[in-house]
């Protein structure tokens, strides 16, 4: 510690209960200007202890409207997450061969994330099966880890596809390297995100940044992010008929797919880059420090 440090305001940004506790203890032990900020992302009502901890914070923020709705009081501000728009770029901005080129001769409906029912993969498969049968040049690509406890779930999904005679059009890639994800997003003709519940949901931002048309469920931050019919489509979680209708609309209209993809990319550049997230956080830090 130095005299200069004693006059500085230190921001402690907590994201979990244990971090709020650490910050409160630190504030008592270290005699410096410490301001504590908490980000609430949980989409559930907090325990009494957590609510008490939040009441001791200098500021509480959230990442989306859905998470904010569970707080006992309105957060000071909403600061959504962002993505690296240089990493997740549209096809037109990428030169050279992609790792996903083996998929390029067909059209693909993709869904990303660890394979389990919570992600709405069963909804997607049931919605897509008749469309795959009617469009043999389209595939369903499920990108994500299959843990041992989910193997039976996957077997049931494959049996469902086999019963509709489209098993060869349903691909489970398994867990993919992090570096392969940008090219996999670009390889998709349509990206879906159909979670029944979601904390925030970066997958949608990554797909939109990649210039892909997105169908997302009304979960996590997705209703905040997507302007339906302008830069993506929104469906209710678990709504098979609605999801099938949205898929059919995009399968049948290439121009609409391209329109949504272009608008999606612009939405990310305007509002959801990681640089913009950092700028908003720094601005909020400065506002807290000045009070």
What residue spans do the PLM features occupy?
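Conserved acidic donor-binding segment of nucleotide-sugar-dependent glycosyltransferases
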Residues: 228-229, 233-240, 249-255
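Aromatic "clamp/platform" in nucleotide-sugar-dependent glycosyltransferases that forms part
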Residues: 196
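Conserved donor-binding/catalytic core segment of Leloir-type glycosyltransferases
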Residues: 99-119, 125-129, 141
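Nucleotide-activated donor-binding/catalytic signature segment of Leloir-type glycosyltransferases, i.e.
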Residues: 29, 154-175
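A short helix/loop element that forms part of the nucleotide-sugar donor recognition site in Leloir-type
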Residues: 89-103, 157
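Short hydrophobic beta-strand element within catalytic cores of glycosyltransferases
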Residues: 213-217, 226
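A conserved, positively charged/aromatic
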Residues: 32-58
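Short alpha-helical donor nucleotide-sugar binding micro-motif in glycosyltransferases
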Residues: 175-176, 183-188
């Amino acid at each position: 510690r130095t005299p200069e440090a004693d006059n500085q305001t230190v921001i402690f940004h907590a994201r979990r209960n244990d971090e709020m506790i650490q910050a409160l203890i630190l504030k008592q032990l270290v005699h410096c200007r410490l301001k504590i900020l908490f980000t609430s992302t949980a989409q559930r009502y907090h325990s009494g202890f957590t609510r008490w901890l939040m009441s001791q914070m200098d500021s509480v923020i959230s990442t989306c409207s859905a998470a904010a709705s569970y707080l006992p009081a309105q957060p000071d501000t909403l600061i959504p997450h962002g993505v690296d728009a240089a990493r997740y770029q549209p096809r037109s901005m990428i030169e050279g061969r992609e790792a996903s080129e083996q998929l390029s001769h067909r059209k693909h409906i993709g869904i990303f994330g660890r394979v389990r029912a919570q992600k709405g993969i069963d909804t997607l498969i049931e919605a897509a099966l008749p469309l795959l049968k009617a469009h043999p040049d389209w595939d369903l690509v499920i990108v994500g880890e299959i843990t041992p406890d989910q193997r039976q779930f996957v077997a049931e999904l494959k049996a469902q596809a086999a019963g509709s005679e489209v098993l060869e059009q349903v691909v489970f890639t398994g867990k993919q390297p992090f570096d392969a994800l940008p090219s996999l997003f670009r390889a998709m003709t349509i990206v879906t995100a159909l979670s029944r519940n979601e904390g925030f949901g970066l997958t949608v931002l990554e797909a939109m940044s990649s210039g892909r048309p997105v169908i997302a469920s009304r979960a996590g931050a997705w209703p905040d992010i997507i302007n339906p019919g302008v830069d993506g489509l929104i469906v209710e979680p678990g709504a098979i008929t609605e999801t099938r209708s949205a898929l059919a609309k995009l399968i049948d209209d290439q121009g609409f797919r391209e329109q949504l993809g272009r608008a999606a990319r612009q939405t990310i550049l305007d509002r959801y880059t990681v640089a913009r997230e950092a700028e908003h956080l720094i601005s909020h830090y400065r506002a807290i420090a000045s009070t």
